[in-house]
């Protein structure tokens, strides 16, 4: 049944597609995922072990595996995050009963048994058909440890290859993405950029390429508005890296309450939309400008390898496990963010939402043998056709709202009620992605299609009665996509009648 919700007070917006300017491909890695040893992201989320009563394949939850296959996960980052700089990979190989236990000092002091290690992660990537992105331990590890890890994973012969074969894996894995440290300005060592730059150059030297495997080396980059860190690394390391990371969270404060995931007022909602829309666009634009200064040829990519919402933990959950619910507000954050990412793919190579299961803005939530799909998951599923399509630049004219700016001494953010992106697939199909963030008003969006011809197909809408609505194990289908009939083409324009707080994706072919 197609859904065309009633339109009460209706605003108007217009979009102009610049079809002739379409040339930059939307890298599928923009839709990357992040799995850290944090709370129940790995243990209970992805992994239950082969002896579990929960249906599994080689220890991986079948329900989660299928959910991730359905959104075509292109790349997965592991083992962290802050965890990466305390992780010693050799503790996570060999017979599981012989692996030493460890305390996860960063995240709640949980004691882990190391049953999920290198083999388990890389085999998971093979099952999903995605690229692994492995973060090396620079904070508490050694150059030798990092070098041997790369050799263990990718060499066909030699002492580390022999050890890998003894542990049951004859053929080396293909590992392309290597992160040299994580948040080295913070939990990864509280380093100065000058010091980390020297460490990066040293570590990457000994991460060698074996047996035809190519390494894409990523330096630990800045957080948010730290442009000096980016400038220092670009100045000192540009000849030694393929990519530079960046972290940006929709988080109100790093001290004190971050606000509830499901109980918030209108001002808090609009702050989040402005933070993920205008805020992330500003950071990407300014960080890329710094990179352009040192690398005008665009040889070095930017990787936003941590992003998403960060609210207070779910009531009753364990401190430090960062388990949070996921509402229609989070779905709107995802849509606004992805629409923005599409505009920067000339430099933006990869984005990894935090995190894949049970942590922060997750795709799925699990509890014992139950699993539910979050509103954010559905946005990722609706946006799948954009992977590897060519971004179509566009302009949007609509009403704006102003919201608080959490940066001190900064003006309030002014953000659009309507966010849009468009892309063209190899077969000529055009994807249109729209989000109406207005809490009170429907919006009639008129899109000038230019030379595009075809019919509206596969139109879907994600919306709910209340923007705080979310899926629970008791009611897992409160927020889910439905077929949408409120779009039509007339006189060279696509007209979409968007309900309030809704996300619409459709195709023209």
Predicted regions and their residues:
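Active-site His/acidic residue clusters
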Residues: 249-271, 317
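N-terminal signal peptide c-region/cleavage motif recognized by signal peptidases
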Residues: 4-6
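Non-catalytic accessory regions flanking glycosidase/transglycosidase catalytic cores in CAZymes
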Residues: 8-243, 277-281, 285-313, 317-509
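Histidine-centered catalytic micro-motifs
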Residues: 246
């Amino acid at each position: 049944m197609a859904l065309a919700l009633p339109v009460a007070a209706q605003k108007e917006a217009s979009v102009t597609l610049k079809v002739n300017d379409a040339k930059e491909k939307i890298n599928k890695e923009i839709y990357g995922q992040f799995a850290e040893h944090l709370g129940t992201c790995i243990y209970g989320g992805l992994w239950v072990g082969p002896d579990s009563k929960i249906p599994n394949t080689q220890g991986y939850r079948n329900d989660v595996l299928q959910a991730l296959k359905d959104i075509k996960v292109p790349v997965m980052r592991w083992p962290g995050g802050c965890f990466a700089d305390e992780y010693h990979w050799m503790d996570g190989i060999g017979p599981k009963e012989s692996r030493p236990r460890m305390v996860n000092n960063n995240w709640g002091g949980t004691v882990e048994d190391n049953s999920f290690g290198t083999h388990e992660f890389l085999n998971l990537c093979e099952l999903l058909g995605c690229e692994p992105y492995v973060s090396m331990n620079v904070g508490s590890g050694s150059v030798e440890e990092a070098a041997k890890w790369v050799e263990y994973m990718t060499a066909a012969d030699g002492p580390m290859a022999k050890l890998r074969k003894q542990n049951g894996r004859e053929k080396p894995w293909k590992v392309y993405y290597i992160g040299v440290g994580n948040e080295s300005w913070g939990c990864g060592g509280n380093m100065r950029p000058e010091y980390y730059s020297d460490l990066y150059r040293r570590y990457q030297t000994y991460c060698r390429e074996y047996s035809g495997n190519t390494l894409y080396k990523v330096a630990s980059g800045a957080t948010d508005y730290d442009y000096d860190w980016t400038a220092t690394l670009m100045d000192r390391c540009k000849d030694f890296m393929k990519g530079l990371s960046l972290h940006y969270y929709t988080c109100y404060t790093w001290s004190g309450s971050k606000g509830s995931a499901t109980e918030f007022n209108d001002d808090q909602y609009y702050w989040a939309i402005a933070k993920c829309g205008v805020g992330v666009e500003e950071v990407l634009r300014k960080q890329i400008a710094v990179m352009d200064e040192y690398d005008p040829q665009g040889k070095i990519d930017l990787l936003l390898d941590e992003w998403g919402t960060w609210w207070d933990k779910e009531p009753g959950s364990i401190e430090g496990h960062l388990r949070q619910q996921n509402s229609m507000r989070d779905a709107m954050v995802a849509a606004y963010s992805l629409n923005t990412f599409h505009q920067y793919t000339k430099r933006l190579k990869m984005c990894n939402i935090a995190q894949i299961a049970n942590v922060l803005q997750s795709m799925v939530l699990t509890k014992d043998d139950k699993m539910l799909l979050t509103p954010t998951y559905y946005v990722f599923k609706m946006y799948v056709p954009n992977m590897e399509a060519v971004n179509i630049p566009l302009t949007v004219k609509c009403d704006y709202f102003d919201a608080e700016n959490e940066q001190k001494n900064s003006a309030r953010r002014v953000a659009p009620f309507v966010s849009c992106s468009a892309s063209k697939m190899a077969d000529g199909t055009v994807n249109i992605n729209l989000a109406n963030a207005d809490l009170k008003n429907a919006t009639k969006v008129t899109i000038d299609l230019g030379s595009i011809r075809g019919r509206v197909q596969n139109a879907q809408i994600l919306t709910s009665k209340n923007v705080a609505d979310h899926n629970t194990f008791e009611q897992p289908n409160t927020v889910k996509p439905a077929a949408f009939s409120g779009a039509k083409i007339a006189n060279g324009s696509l007209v979409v009648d968007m309900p309030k707080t809704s996300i619409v994706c459709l195709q023209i072919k």
